């Protein structure tokens, strides 16, 4: 769908290992830089699903990251907010993660809201958009964004795991795992052939081989990098541990 990807999107499509760190949107510029350099990390993930986060705070945080040249992946508040993805992106994130994805309709709506025409139907606007100052012409901006922005769909149930190959539609860059909610789902399916979160991660990684769509897992600390890399996970999201 997006043959000429650039930057981080291109690296993900090529199956390169990508490292990210989770940070609060209240983090100041000095700590952002210290965390990114400590990895070194390729992107920062910020969350609104389980965290209080105003639009103004998101604009401010993304502005700081833009000044530092740091890629921001943003998890939206709820699955049903997929129709607002374009609005969220107008506030400055470089990518979006949609939590608790299970239905084809969610993916279709996310793709339409994420990409500009002809790949999608995102509306043009927003002064805080990443890259807005460098691409003033709307058509030029849309073409650039469609090769740059990164869309994750988060899978957090056994049902979503077994349908991963269907949810991984063209234009989706990554399927990410929500291990805690997935653990609850596994307990509801005690006789399923997938018994653990690790089983699910390995299953999805195998099912996406050769598609150019990455698998992301929240791995806690850097000590777990090799374990999940060996499973086929190429996007590793860690908790920022450096103290400043």
Predicted segments with their positions:
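C-terminal alpha-helical cap/extension of soluble enzyme domains
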Residues: 125-133, 152-162, 192, 198-244
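Conserved anion-binding
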Residues: 95-170, 179-184
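Hydrophobic faces of well-ordered beta-strands that scaffold small-molecule active sites
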Residues: 18-23, 44-46, 72-76, 96-98, ...
């Amino acid at each position: 769908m997006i043959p000429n990807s650039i930057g981080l999107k291109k690296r993900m499509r090529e199956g390169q290992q990508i490292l990210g760190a989770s940070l609060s949107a209240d983090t100041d510029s000095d700590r952002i830089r210290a965390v990114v350099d400590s990895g070194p990390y390729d992107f920062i993930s910020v969350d609104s699903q389980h965290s209080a986060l105003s639009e103004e705070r998101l604009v401010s945080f993304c502005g700081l990251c833009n000044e530092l040249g740091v890629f921001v992946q943003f998890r939206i508040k709820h699955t049903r907010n997929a129709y607002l993805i374009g609005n969220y992106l107008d506030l400055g994130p470089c990518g979006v993660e949609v939590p608790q994805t299970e239905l084809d309709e969610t993916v279709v709506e996310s793709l339409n809201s994420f990409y500009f025409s002809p790949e999608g139907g995102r509306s043009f606007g927003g002064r805080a958009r990443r890259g807005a100052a460098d691409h003033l012409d709307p058509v030029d901006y849309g073409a650039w964004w469609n090769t740059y922005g990164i869309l994750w769909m988060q899978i957090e149930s056994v049902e979503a795991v077994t349908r991963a190959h269907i949810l991984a539609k063209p234009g989706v860059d990554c399927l990410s795992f929500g291990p805690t909610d997935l653990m609850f789902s596994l307990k509801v399916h005690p006789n399923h052939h997938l018994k653990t979160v690790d089983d699910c991660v390995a299953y999805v990684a195998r099912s996406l081989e050769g598609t150019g769509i990455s698998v992301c897992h929240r791995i806690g600390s850097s000590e777990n990098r090799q374990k999940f890399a060996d499973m086929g996970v190429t996007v590793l999201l860690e908790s920022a541990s450096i103290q400043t």
